[in-house]
């Protein structure tokens, strides 16, 4: 029997190998296969946002001014969501709504879907970039796994929540003041602050901030080798290559402070990874629940007693009244197409909430 050697060896000029060699070449800014998704999507998302906040009005979708051209500033400009009547249309430039007319596409809110979808894929591309580089330098992929937290929050808030509602209209617009208004909307219509998933998200994010502050301060406090400057600040060198802090000293310090302390760096740093990522994932799950109009905690017994007894009031019942005021004010303003009319006696009156 004859054996053909090298029969299945790859052609040296194979197109995939040529592209792989160029994409993953060592350069100042790594490109990689993930870059084919990341860079175009990030460019279009950021470019679309700058274009919208600079030039595009929200008059036709929200009845608002939202661009620098109309007199907004950085905090009040936004790329606004499409009108509620457009439901969940992708609003493609060549679609039946805009029919290839760029000006009409902008007026209809096409830039919002453009920025949201390119932004989502850009974030996914950035996570894939971390996977790819970790693989290249033989690291574990925990950076990429951690970045799944922000991606989950973005996708749940900007895509899944409006998909569960009547249209993109109910997603946040891309702007600072617009996001603040969306937060108030979430509170008034979903009582978001009393949602256990929001509580877990707050605990995760603020807990992570506390852990970062404690960890950074502890490492700086336990440096045992510094430069030879005359005082502490001159001797401290932030670019020192060697690890010269004492885990043993840090453990002793926190054992005396709290009675317990991390005994090894692996568990400490895993905990610092686990707390914020879990918090972000929990808040994302909560927003998915809101997309389905799942309710937060309801203490109905307190509401009934407060309605029957004028002298009984709790912070919960006061917040429920506040939420009713938010709904009464925001619904008529945000959804004029619904022709909502509230009797004067149910509208909030100054401090009389």
From Swiss-Prot:
Pfam families: Photo_RC. Fe cation binds at residues 215, 269. Its EC number is 1.10.3.9. The modification N-acetylthreonine is found at residue 2. Gene3D superfamilies: Photosystem II protein D1-like (1.20.85.10). It is found in: Plastid, Chloroplast thylakoid membrane. GO terms for cellular component: chloroplast thylakoid membrane; photosystem II. GO terms for molecular function: chlorophyll binding; electron transporter, transferring electrons within the cyclic electron transport pathway of photosynthesis activity; iron ion binding; oxygen evolving activity. The chain crosses the membrane at residues 41-61, 125-141, 153-166, 208-228, 279-295. It is a multi-pass membrane protein. The keyword Cytoplasm does not apply. It is an enzyme of class 1 (oxidoreductase). The modification Phosphothreonine is found at residue 2. One of its GO terms (biological process) is photosynthetic electron transport in photosystem II. Chlorophyll a ChlzD2 binds at residue 118. Pheophytin a binds at residues 130, 143. Coiled coil: none annotated. Keywords: Acetylation, Chlorophyll, Chloroplast, Chromophore, Electron transport, Iron, Magnesium, Membrane, Metal-binding, Oxidoreductase, Phosphoprotein, Photosynthesis, Photosystem II, Plastid, Thylakoid, Transmembrane, Transmembrane helix, Transport. Chlorophyll a PD2 binds at residue 198. A plastoquinone binds at residues 215, 262. Belongs to the reaction center PufL/M/PsbA/D family. 2 of the reaction center chlorophylls (ChlD1 and ChlD2) are entirely coordinated by water. Photosystem II (PSII) is a light-driven water:plastoquinone oxidoreductase that uses light energy to abstract electrons from H(2)O, generating O(2) and a proton gradient subsequently used for ATP formation. It consists of a core antenna complex that captures photons, and an electron transfer chain that converts photonic excitation into a charge separation. The D1/D2 (PsbA/PsbD) reaction center heterodimer binds P680, the primary electron donor of PSII as well as several subsequent electron acceptors. D2 is needed for assembly of a stable PSII complex. PSII is composed of 1 copy each of membrane proteins PsbA, PsbB, PsbC, PsbD, PsbE, PsbF, PsbH, PsbI, PsbJ, PsbK, PsbL, PsbM, PsbT, PsbX, PsbY, PsbZ, Psb30/Ycf12, at least 3 peripheral proteins of the oxygen-evolving complex and a large number of cofactors. It forms dimeric complexes. This is Photosystem II D2 protein. The gene is psbD.
């Amino acid at each position: 029997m004859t054996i053909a050697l090298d029969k299945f060896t790859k052609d040296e000029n194979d197109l995939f190998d040529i592209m792989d060699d160029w994409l993953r070449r060592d350069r100042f800014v790594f490109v990689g296969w993930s870059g084919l998704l990341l860079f175009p999507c990030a460019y279009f998302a950021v470019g679309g946002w700058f274009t919208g906040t600079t030039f595009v009005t929200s008059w036709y979708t929200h009845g608002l001014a939202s661009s620098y051209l109309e007199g907004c500033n950085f905090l009040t400009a936004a790329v606004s969501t499409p009108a509620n009547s457009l439901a969940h249309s992708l609003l493609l430039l060549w679609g039946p709504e805009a029919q290839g007319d760029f000006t009409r596409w902008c007026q209809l809110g096409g830039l919002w879907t453009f920025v949201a979808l390119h932004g989502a894929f850009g974030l996914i591309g950035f996570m894939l970039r971390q996977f790819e580089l970790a693989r290249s330098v033989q690291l574990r992929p925990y950076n990429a796994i951690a970045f799944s937290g922000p991606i989950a929050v973005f996708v749940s808030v900007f895509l899944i929540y409006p998909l569960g509602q009547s249209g993109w209209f109910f997603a946040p617009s891309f702007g600072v003041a617009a996001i603040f208004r969306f937060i108030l909307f979430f509170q008034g219509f979903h009582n978001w602050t009393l949602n256990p998933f929001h509580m877990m998200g707050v605990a995760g994010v603020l807990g992570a901030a506390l852990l970062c502050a404690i960890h950074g301060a502890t490492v700086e406090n336990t440096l045992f080798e510094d430069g030879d400057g005359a005082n502490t600040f001159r001797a401290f060198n932030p670019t020192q290559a060697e690890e010269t802090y004492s885990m043993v000293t840090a453990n002793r310090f926190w054992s005396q402070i709290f009675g317990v302390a991390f005994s090894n760096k692996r568990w400490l740093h895993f905990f610092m990874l686990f707390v914020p990522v879990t918090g972000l994932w929990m808040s994302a799950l909560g927003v998915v629940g809101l997309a389905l109009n799942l309710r937060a905690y309801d203490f109905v017994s307190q509401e009934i007693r407060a309605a029957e007894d004028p002298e009984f009031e709790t912070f919960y019942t006061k917040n429920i009244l506040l939420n009713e005021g938010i709904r009464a004010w925001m619904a008529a303003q945000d959804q004029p197409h619904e022709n909502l009319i509230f009797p004067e006696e149910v509208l909030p009156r100054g401090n009389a909430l």
